[in-house]
């Protein structure tokens, strides 16, 4: 049986860690790509990972390269390329530079792997995945953004820490943009099947939501020289697994919404069924009035971000 071919674009912390997770889980063979000026760096990381395989007991081929020809006919491509956040920066501060990087990557993917499912990780996420979709011209189901899995994982972690319970017993959902306007859905949040609102006061829940919104910035401020990578890479690997194994996972991703939720042609975080074809369907929830208002506010922020990006690229 043919192994899946998984390409990671960007061999920095997120990309290399994602390659590690994917290889260790034997999700397929991995190509780790970076720009030519990095010279042999991706090859070095790939070789290091390969040498871990006999110790950790996984059997995946891992190749490092600076040539998109080596990525040809990939099944899944994870795009982590772009400048990372530094202390004091918002995700939006990266907009102009990373939009140009993502445009270049999109053109290469279109030429070499026209049938791939693309997972965009580069920030600001909601604008970058929109740009990837625009430049590749791929069907919208095959271009998705990694945001909701990570945001929900952070939310679940903080809830578990607050309650002193296992993270495995926390079920939660966050929607909307990847940033300060992300929307918690309390009606879809439970602890061992118990509604979270029965266990935590609204005031304390609001504080946990606020920490979740600032979760990436908190890590940036602690690291000082970089941004989060273990959890973002793990989130990517979970999405890759859902695709290559056709698992039909119900998870939140940045998906192209047209009529869904009345969004009107933008990428925004919503729950989907994720399988071999990418987004197989978007799940539309009945939100409360408060949740609906917060979600629309988040969508408006995404639209404004995309409009700003389009203006910068047109200059």
Curated annotation (Swiss-Prot):
A Pfam family matched in the record: Ldh_1_N
Protein name: Malate dehydrogenase
Keyword NAD recorded: yes
Gene designation per UniProt: mdh
Binding site residues for substrate: 85, 91, 123, 154
Binding site for NAD(+): 10-15, 34, 98, 121-123
One of the GO biological process terms: carboxylic acid metabolic process
Active site: 178
Catalytic activity: (S)-malate + NAD(+) = oxaloacetate + NADH + H(+)
UniProt cross-references to PANTHER family, sorted A to Z: L-2-HYDROXYCARBOXYLATE DEHYDROGENASE (NAD(P)(+)) (PTHR43128), L-LACTATE DEHYDROGENASE (PTHR43128:SF16)
């Amino acid at each position: 049986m043919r192994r899946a071919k998984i390409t990671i674009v960007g061999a920095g912390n997120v990309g290399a860690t994602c390659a590690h997770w994917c290889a260790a889980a034997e999700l397929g063979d991995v190509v780790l790509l970076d720009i030519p000026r990095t010279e042999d760096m991706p090859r070095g990381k790939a070789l290091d990972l390969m040498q871990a395989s006999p110790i950790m007991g996984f059997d995946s081929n891992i190749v490092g390269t600076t040539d998109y020809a080596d990525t040809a006919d990939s099944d899944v491509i994870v795009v982590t390329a772009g400048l990372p956040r530094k202390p004091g920066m918002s995700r939006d501060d990266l907009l102009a530079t990373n939009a140009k990087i993502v445009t270049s990557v999109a053109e290469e993917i279109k030429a070499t792997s026209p049938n791939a499912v693309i997972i965009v990780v580069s920030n600001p996420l909601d604008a970058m995945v929109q740009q990837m979709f625009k430049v590749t011209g791929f069907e919208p189901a095959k271009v998705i953004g990694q945001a909701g899995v990570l945001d929900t994982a952070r939310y679940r972690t903080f809830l578990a820490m607050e309650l002193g319970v296992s993270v495995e017993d926390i079920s939660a959902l966050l929607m909307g943009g990847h940033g300060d306007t992300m929307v918690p859905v309390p009606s879809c949040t439970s602890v061992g099947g118990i509604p979270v609102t029965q266990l935590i006061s609204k005031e304390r829940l609001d504080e946990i939501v606020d920490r979740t919104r600032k979760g990436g910035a908190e890590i940036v401020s602690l690291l000082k020289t970089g941004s989060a990578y273990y959890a973002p890479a793990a989130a990517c690997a979970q999405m890759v697994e859902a695709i290559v194994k056709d698992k039909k996972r119900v998870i939140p991703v940045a998906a192209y919404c047209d009529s869904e939720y009345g969004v009107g042609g933008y990428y925004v975080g919503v729950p989907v069924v994720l399988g071999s074809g990418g987004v197989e369907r978007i799940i539309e929830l009945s939100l409360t009035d408060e949740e609906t208002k917060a979600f629309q506010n988040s969508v408006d922020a995404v639209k404004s971000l995309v409009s700003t990006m389009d203006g910068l690229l047109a200059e």
